[in-house]
Amino acid sequence: MAWPCITRACCIARFWNQLDKADIAVPLVFTKYSEATEQPLPAQIPRSAAAPIDTQPGGDARAAGGGDAAPGPARPGTAPHGSPPADSVMRHDYKPWKVQRPEPSCKPKSEYQPSDTPFEKETQYQKDFRAWPIPKRGDHPWIPKAGPSPVLGPERGSPEKAAQEKRRKKEEEAEADEEHPKAARPGDAREKGRQRGDEAGGQEGRGRAAADALNRQIKEEVVAAGVSSSYRNEFRPWIDVKPVKAIKAKAQYKPPEEKMTHETSYSAQFKGETSKPAPADNKFLERRRIRTLYSEPYKEPPKVEKPSVKPSKPKKTTTSHKPLKKAKDKQIASGRAAKKKSAETSNTAKPEDKEKSKEMNNKLAEAKE
């Protein structure tokens, strides 16, 4: 067992004899497992050296002379009372490991071994795709230009081309054909006679001819080498292959020609109870309908015509006094109208009535006094 639970009382009480006491102790306390299992005797008996397995290098000396350790000279860190070193947990009682001969490592040495042949400075990509010469500003070789003299235009680049080919082939290889220098000789004479025409024509034709000559030279170098680029060798276009005809996939869903009914199978199978006719012969259902207060779900209750009497609405008691104000305004308006009418009637009354009314008023005033 490895590190049992020794904090609970149940684990301490149960199977105590079956536990390995060396697992419970701190690992560095015991140098041998036999010291944990065997109980120390009062008289130290010399143990056999082959039985235990030492965990520290200094265990052989202690195992061989276990009984003689006490009378011998004590170690320079042990207690003065001469306790055996097996009981000590001090650091100086355990000698460190001393490895005199280290084992040879199986890991290979990572030493740089230079190759016999030097590396190429130019990569395959640089070989296949070389830089084109930069033409003059505004001179695009892919745009055909109409020269000043259309008759002498195509012949203008031939002497310069021949001269450049001659120089290149002299520098590169001596195995060039003899036709090139022969073709170059009449070109030299033409050049001398044509220099005067070039001066009049301008310098545009010269730059154009030089760019064309360089482009042809690069193309000829590639063809003369006989080796196209590795990318062209690996990825070549298909020849004599007909283009594939586009295939239109058939539609998997075919819509029905006739008109679709928007009724699902669920709605067709489970319809409402209103469509079921009520059985008229069943007296039990009629009695039950009379007894119960509820009407059947598939029978509509008979509609009773209610008398059309409008219930009197209770007056709303609101905090706002708008309806009262309206009533007061109506009363004031009616009073004003009555006064106006009385004034109009009084104006039309006779002056005799006015005098009578004055007399009556005077009599009343005298009576009050």
UniProtKB/Swiss-Prot annotation:
It is found in: Cytoplasm, Cytoskeleton. GO terms for biological process: cytoskeleton-dependent intracellular transport; dendrite morphogenesis; lysosome localization; microtubule cytoskeleton organization; positive regulation of axonogenesis; regulation of microtubule cytoskeleton organization. InterPro entries: MAP6. Residues 89-110, 118-142, 179-209, 297-308, 350-369 have a biased composition (Basic and acidic residues). GO terms for cellular component: axon; cis-Golgi network; dendrite; Golgi-associated vesicle; microtubule. Residues 228-251 are annotated as: Mn 3. Residues 70-80 have a biased composition (Low complexity). Residues 87-110 are annotated as: Mn 1. Residues 122-145 are annotated as: Mn 2. Its main location: cytoplasm. Residues 41-213, 251-369 are annotated as: Disordered. It comes from the Eukaryota. Residues 312-328 have a biased composition (Basic residues). GO terms for molecular function: calmodulin binding; microtubule binding. The keyword Protein biosynthesis does not apply. Keywords: Cytoplasm, Cytoskeleton, Microtubule, Transport. Belongs to the STOP family. Involved in microtubule stabilization in many cell types, including neuronal cells. Specifically has microtubule cold stabilizing activity. Involved in dendrite morphogenesis and maintenance by regulating lysosomal trafficking. PANTHER family: MICROTUBULE-ASSOCIATED PROTEIN 6, STOP PROTEIN. This is Microtubule-associated protein 6 homolog. It comes from Gallus gallus. The gene is MAP6.
